[in-house]
Amino acid sequence: MRKILVTNALPYANGDLHLGHMLGYIQSDIWVRFQKLQGNQCIFICGSDTHGTPIMLKAKSLGITPEELVTKYSNRHLQDFTDFEINFDNYHSTHNSLNKEIVEDIYNKLNNKNLISKKAIAQAYDPEAKMFLPDRFVKGTCPKCKAEDQYGDSCEVCGATYDPTELINPRSVISGQSPIQKNSEHFFFDLPALEKNIKDWIESNTLLQPEVANKLAEWFEQGLQSWDISRDAPYFGFAIPGTNEQKFFYVWLDAPMGYIASFKDYCNKNNINFGDFWGDSSSESELYHFIGKDIIYFHALFWPAILSSTGYKTPTSVFANGFLTVNGKKMSKSRGTFIQARTYLDNLEPSYLRYYFASRLTSRIDDIDLNLEEFVTKSNSDIVGKVVNIASRCAGFIYKKFDATLSGEIFDPELESEFSKNHDAITQAFEKREFAHAVRLIMALADKANQFIDYHKPWQLAKEEGQEQKVHQVCSQGINMFKVLIAYLKPIIPSIVAEAERFLNIQFISWADAPKFLINHKIDKFKPLATRIEKEKVDKILEDTKKMFENEQAPQSKKEEPKLDIAAECTFDDFMKVDLRIAKITEASHVEGADKLLKLILDLGGVTKQVFAGIKSAYKPEDLIGKHTIMVANLAPRKMKFGMSEGMVLAAGDGKGIYILEPHEGAQPGMRVK
């Protein structure tokens, strides 16, 4: 039994998942399900990537805390994964004490090995927003390939990485202004010092995809650079120890460590020894990271370097997948092809998309096109027309005429052998992540099964006298071929297979048993396992997507301007007659017999005045002593039954509360307000 730990890239918790995301998660889930059917101890972990400026700013725009935002999207992501039958063994988060402990421990180990340095660097700064701009909040032209509209850390066209200050014609995505440069002290990880570690890892990695190896060779040729692992406050994340929360760990430092935290959390819950899978000496275990091709740089350079220098096992391999296009073009909100996972799930079953993706996925880093017309045709033809149809054509005869019991003899041993002989080839295809090849092999067997049924025509045999035994044997062989096909498809379409298992009265728990025929076995009554996709369902997905983004982009209705009950207009000269002064409250006390008044003694810089103020409902006397406020110093004294009031303190109110005015720090008693 192999010990395998599989991670998938952590989804960023500031928005909903779309079908492009699901491509990678479906790929890894199929592989994990296959490994578990093989009898291997395969643990599948993931979690939410929850730090960074995008989350901080989005939360601010929504009027909620970053913690509330990431909780909201983490829950939505997990529900999408569950409904798409992505079966993680543990789903965690990067924003918790366990991950913080791991991040700080790894940072301290790197620092103790002199792999962390500090230096002042020029940073992009938005003078309008008054903040340093993280990489992803600067856009411009790539300095390498000159592609436009690229982020400040890496180019999505050529894959190059660079500093935001290297961008051509940079602009702030917050204000649209051209950022200026300001110096700030940052923390750097000495990646060049670990070049040998990375190259040793690459040379020992026999499973590394050629495209990844070629890209790594290109980066080595360009020369490795020290990696900036810090970001300036304000920032949502973990503060770097000893910086008084002015510097924070860059999200790409703590995000991969979320893999470790998620697995440690799983180990704690299930009494598993962490070191057996991810210790430095755990040579017998296997560690695989499934990622998108846009984050190879972080997983195949930085991550092995960090792990190798801090006592952790390096990945057995990193498997990258390509991007998703729809109808041959980049996903588009206006065309309705930027389809969110939930929009799909509201209209169609997940099995169809899982199968379609599997029929296109290989071990290469190829972009996958979701051709919607072909998606409908293939789902209806393969799942419904080929596989499920075999059972529907044979089950009724077995259930009604032969007491729901399969024959004790195999009618066509040669055909049975062909189904069995393909087991090794299908197994190898799944193991190597050549899912498209596995699907082709399975569908070729489905074609043979349907040809067998078409040739023998059990529906005609059933009408002929003396052909009962042949009908029994032909239909039993048909059900058995269906059983083998459905077992091979279990990693791909688990919910349909679960229904088939109930019909067959078995449970596929061993991959080795997949090609075995059932003899004298009792089945249940057949019920439809899948229905054909109607084109209208797909059209509705596109329409729902268009409407969703139209609503997002529609201008907000103009709010009615609030109306203020402004007093009658006065001249400037009239206003200047009012002498407003800074006053310090030296004494404050209750007024006996007064429900609303407090007695205040005010110091105006050597001159003392007594004022009765109607602020008792809002303030305790002891809380006011020592505060500075603003008073009308030249208001005619007013004799009250409690004493003489020699002015008025200024306060604001809306009928719900009272707020005395306080001047800015530095204002002194007696200063005139102008």
Curated annotation (Swiss-Prot):
- This enzyme's EC code(s): 6.1.1.10
Give, as one word, the top-level EC class: ligase
Q: Which family does it belong to?
A: Belongs to the class-I aminoacyl-tRNA synthetase family. MetG type 1 subfamily.
Localization terms from the record: Cytoplasm
Q: Name one GO cellular component term.
A: cytosol
Q: What is known about its subunit structure? A: Homodimer.
The entry's free-text remark on the cofactor is:
Binds 1 zinc ion per subunit.
Reaction(s) catalysed by this chain, per the record, are: tRNA(Met) + L-methionine + ATP = L-methionyl-tRNA(Met) + AMP + diphosphate
Its function, per the record, reads: Is required not only for elongation of protein synthesis but also for the initiation of all mRNA translation through initiator tRNA(fMet) aminoacylation.
The taxonomic lineage of its organism, from the top, reads:
Bacteria, Pseudomonadati, Pseudomonadota, Gammaproteobacteria, Thiotrichales
Where ATP binds, per the record, is at 333
Note the superkingdom of the native organism.
Bacteria
The primary location reported for this protein is cytoplasm
PANTHER family tied to this protein: METHIONINE--TRNA LIGASE, METHIONINE--TRNA LIGASE, CYTOPLASMIC
Q: Which residues bind Zn(2+)?
A: 142, 145, 155, 158
Q: Which residues form the tRNA-binding domain?
A: 574-674
- Please name the GO terms of the biological process aspect recorded for this protein, alphabetically: methionyl-tRNA aminoacylation
Per UniProt, the short sequence motif 'KMSKS' region occupies residue numbers 330-334
Query: What is this protein's name?
Result: Methionine--tRNA ligase
Keyword Ligase (UniProt): yes
Which UniProt keywords are given for this protein, alphabetically ordered?
Answer: Aminoacyl-tRNA synthetase, ATP-binding, Cytoplasm, Ligase, Metal-binding, Nucleotide-binding, Protein biosynthesis, RNA-binding, tRNA-binding, Zinc
Q: Where is this motif: 'HIGH' region?
A: 11-21
| Cofactor requirements of the protein | Zn(2+)
Q: Which organism is it from?
A: Francisella tularensis subsp. holarctica (strain OSU18)
The Gene Ontology terms for molecular function here are: ATP binding; metal ion binding; methionine-tRNA ligase activity; tRNA binding
